[in-house]
Amino acid sequence: KYSPAVRHRIQSGFNVSAIDYVRAQRARQWFSHQMAESMKKVDVLITPSVPIQTPTITDCTPAPGKSTAGGELAIFTGVFDTTGQPSHLIPCGFTIGGMPIGMMINGHPFDESTVLRVGHAFEKLTNWHQRPPTDIPATI
């Protein structure tokens, strides 16, 4: 069973016309090309996994007629989901309140090996991946 918010997102896809779908695919191809061009001088691009402190489930549950923090969560992941570039999300710390912080290692199309090697190197130098969050409210 889907939550009302997820059900709404799925149902909104039923209203996309074939013309709008083709336009969106063309825009996606253009954007993918722009991202590939912008990353030519780097091996990977490291970003936060989310642009805000990790919200609780309560923070992401919309009240009737209200938006939630959940919509902001996909700002970084959505870019690379759209372009099809490989990404690896790994823990890199905690907020003062104990909420987990993650970073996203993003690579060139079809270069998963570099993304995973960078992630592995980070994990060898740190121990964040071995430290589970403690005493925090339920998170998504």
Short names for language-model regions:
Residues 1-32, 89-100:
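Short helix-loop capping/hinge segments that flank enzyme active sites or metal/cofactor-binding pockets
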Residues 36-37, 67-90:
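Small-aliphatic-rich amphipathic alpha-helix that forms the alpha element of a beta-alpha
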Residues 99-108, 115-119:
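Short, well-ordered beta-strand elements
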Residues 115-140:
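Short, gly/Ser/Thr-rich active-site loops of penicillin-recognizing serine hydrolases
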Residues 50:
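Short glycine-/small-residue-rich Rossmann-like dinucleotide-binding loops
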Residues 22-23, 53-74:
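Short, surface-exposed loop/helix-turn segments at secondary-structure junctions
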